[in-house]
């Protein structure tokens, strides 16, 4: 089951009602001590900021500290291993995101299986992407881009912030579904990739809207389509790619997981508390400012979403024939 933005917006409406409900039922005496949330990436990035924001809210509302711990390396696998070594008691949680879903196939860890060993707890947010081209590129729409690419196979360079991440595989998914031959020329980080695009060393990129919006608004880059299932508030005149490539949908995901065996009542309690946090106007405003659409869903929905994402990116990894050294 793939969740569209409409379904998430419906869930958001439900979550918005949480403040009017009675106090969320506590799972036995949980939490009786601080809770650790392990993040697989360095401090300071948008996912880190979002998780810390939510951890602060939870600490205030629950009455126990939620402590964020960064364990970067191996595309999130080091953090996952650290969480799986901890007791499955709800006191060690894992920040989950698109890198985890991609790495399940791209860089699998022999010590765990993401879907088998990690229990989905809650969604946090989705970061929409946009397909942008150099303004001198002849195509002004997604259909024109596809037609041009098919007439000029191998002559369009697609940049990204690095091999194997979502800016890369968003483009590979597009290539696979649109049937076009575009050459991936990775940059080393956001700045280099955008510089290559602005200088016309690359002609197309799939990038988070929050990173690209200023260039689009200034006319330095042209947006052809957003990667989400429905149009985006910040770019209301830009159509979805899925309008022309049926089924195409991508955005960066962020959520929380726990080790397999974590008590069900603890998982349900955490899910309810996180969803209540996402319904808080101050939290919602901060998330939107960081480029995220709040993602309040049930534990079961987030689990289905995890499985769908892992399966989707497994197909793309196979198509792209990417192997990390």
Regions found by a protein language model. Give the residues of each.
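Short loop/turn segments at beta->alpha junctions
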Residues: 4, 75, 141, 188-190, ...
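N-terminal twin-arginine translocation
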Residues: 1-10, 15-29
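An extracytoplasmic/periplasmic, membrane-proximal ligand-sensing/linker region
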Residues: 32-34, 176-177, 217, 240, ...
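A ligand-binding cleft/hinge motif common to bilobed small-molecule-binding domains
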Residues: 100-109, 175-177, 204-236
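N-terminal (or domain-start) structured segment
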Residues: 26-115, 155-157, 180-203, 296, ...
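Hinge/capping helix and adjacent helix->loop/strand transition within the periplasmic-binding protein
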Residues: 85-90, 105-192, 241, 246, ...
């Amino acid at each position: 089951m793939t969740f569209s933005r409409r379904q998430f917006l419906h869930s958001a409406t439900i979550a918005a009602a949480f403040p009017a409900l009675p106090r969320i039922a506590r799972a036995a005496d949980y939490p009786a001590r601080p809770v650790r949330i392990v993040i697989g990436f360095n401090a300071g990035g948008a996912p880190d900021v979002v998780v810390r924001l939510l951890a602060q809210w939870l600490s205030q509302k629950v009455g126990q500290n939620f402590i964020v711990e960064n364990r970067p390396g191996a595309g999130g696998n080091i953090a996952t291993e650290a969480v799986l070594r901890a007791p499955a008691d709800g006191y060690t949680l894992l920040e989950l995101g698109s890198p985890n879903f991609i790495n399940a196939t791209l860089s699998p860890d022999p010590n765990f299986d993401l879907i088998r060993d990690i229990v989905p707890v809650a969604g946090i947010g989705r970061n929409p992407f946009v397909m942008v081209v150099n303004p001198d590129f002849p195509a002004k729409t997604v259909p024109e881009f596809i037609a041009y690419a098919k007439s000029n196979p191998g002559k369009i360079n697609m940049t990204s912030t690095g091999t194997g991440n979502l800016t890369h595989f968003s483009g590979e998914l597009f290539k696979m579904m649109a049937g076009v031959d575009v050459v991936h020329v990775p940059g080393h980080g956001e700045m280099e990739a955008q510089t290559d695009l602005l200088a016309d060393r690359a002609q197309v990129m799939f990038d988070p809207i929050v990173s690209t919006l200023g260039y689009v608004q200034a006319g330095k880059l042209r947006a052809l389509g957003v990667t989400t299932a429905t149009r985006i508030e910040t770019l209301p005149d830009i159509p979805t790619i899925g309008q022309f490539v049926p089924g195409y949908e991508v955005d960066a995901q962020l959520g929380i997981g726990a080790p397999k065996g974590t008590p069900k009542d603890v998982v349900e309690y955490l899910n309810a508390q996180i969803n209540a946090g996402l319904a808080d106007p101050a939290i919602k405003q901060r998330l939107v400012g960081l480029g995220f659409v709040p993602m309040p869903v049930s534990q079961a929905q987030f689990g289905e979403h995890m499985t769908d994402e892992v399966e989707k990116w497994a197909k793309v990894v196979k198509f792209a024939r990417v192997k990390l050294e």
